[in-house]
């Protein structure tokens, strides 16, 4: 019975951890929380866009 509870807890942990990666970054606070930085117009070389900060013209970029 203890093994059943352990497996259930592991399953819950795996499923809850993956749910955050499917949501897009849409504001400056969530950009910083996802290790990103708000840069006007375009992301710098070596960085990729992971969302937006204030609108479509300000992307959230991360290395």
Curated annotation (Swiss-Prot):
The modification Pyrrolidone carboxylic acid is found at residue 23. Its main location: secreted. One of its GO terms (molecular function) is CCR6 chemokine receptor binding. Coiled coil: none annotated. Keywords: Antibiotic, Antimicrobial, Defensin, Disulfide bond, Pyrrolidone carboxylic acid, Secreted, Signal. It is found in: Secreted. One of its GO terms (cellular component) is extracellular space. The keyword Disulfide bond applies. InterPro entries: Beta/alpha-defensin_C (IPR006080), Defensin_beta-like (IPR001855). It comes from the Eukaryota. GO terms for biological process: cell chemotaxis; defense response to bacterium. Disulfide bonds join 31-60, 38-53, 43-61. Pfam families: Defensin_beta. Residues 1-22 form the signal peptide. Neutrophilic granules. Belongs to the beta-defensin family. Has bactericidal activity. Active against E.coli ML35 and S.aureus 502A. This is Beta-defensin 4.
């Amino acid at each position: 019975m203890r093994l059943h509870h352990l497996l259930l807890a592991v399953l819950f942990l795996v499923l809850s951890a993956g749910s955050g990666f499917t949501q897009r970054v849409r504001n400056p606070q969530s950009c910083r929380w996802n290790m990103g930085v708000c840069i006007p117009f375009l992301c710098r070389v070596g960085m990729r866009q992971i969302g937006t900060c204030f609108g479509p013209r300000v992307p959230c970029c991360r290395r």
